[in-house]
Amino acid sequence: MAKQKKHPTGTIAQNKKARHDYFIEHKFEAGLVLAGWEVKSLRASKLQLVDSYVLLKDGEAWLLGSHITPLMTASTHVIADPVRTRKLLLNRRELDKLAAAVQQKGYACVCLSWYWSKHMVKCEIALGKGKKEYDKRDTERERDAGRELQRAVRNKGKED
């Protein structure tokens, strides 16, 4: 009897800049249409999501700006395009909700992360409202204040 292969689990890559630049309001899980060489590269975590975003066009969602570095051993017979536009698989209801929200000023649809769900690659996309410069500074101040508080609590425990 053949041994069952374990499915890879966990996050492949995250877009930390998206959380810095946007207030995340709603999250969606989307499937992806990928080529074989892309899946092999994803198993090796060769993915960058820094400037990736979602474009809604003709009732479909497309992911632009994600970069999958091709493995030399996996893409020998195919001309690999690392930054090609990839189709996202969403329900009609989710697509309609995203399309209506993106029409409003200041809202955008961005990719937050890619992860394995059983043997499938999923993309977590989010509807976010763009942060202003002062919002980013406020977030940084709150984070620093939280760190100072944790540091004070930790030091207080050591003094006793």
UniProtKB/Swiss-Prot annotation:
Mitochondrion keyword on record: no
Disordered as annotated region, ranges: 131-160
GO CC annotation: cytosol
Keywords: Cytoplasm, RNA-binding
Chief localisation class: cytoplasm
Subcellular location field: Cytoplasm
Single annotated GO MF: RNA binding
GO BP terms, alphabetized: trans-translation
Protein family per UniProt: Belongs to the SmpB family.
Job of this protein: Required for rescue of stalled ribosomes mediated by trans-translation. Binds to transfer-messenger RNA (tmRNA), required for stable association of tmRNA with ribosomes. tmRNA and SmpB together mimic tRNA shape, replacing the anticodon stem-loop with SmpB. tmRNA is encoded by the ssrA gene; the 2 termini fold to resemble tRNA(Ala) and it encodes a 'tag peptide', a short internal open reading frame. During trans-translation Ala-aminoacylated tmRNA acts like a tRNA, entering the A-site of stalled ribosomes, displacing the stalled mRNA.
Protein name, as recorded: SsrA-binding protein
Native source organism of the sequence: Pseudomonas fluorescens (strain Pf0-1)
Gene behind the chain: smpB
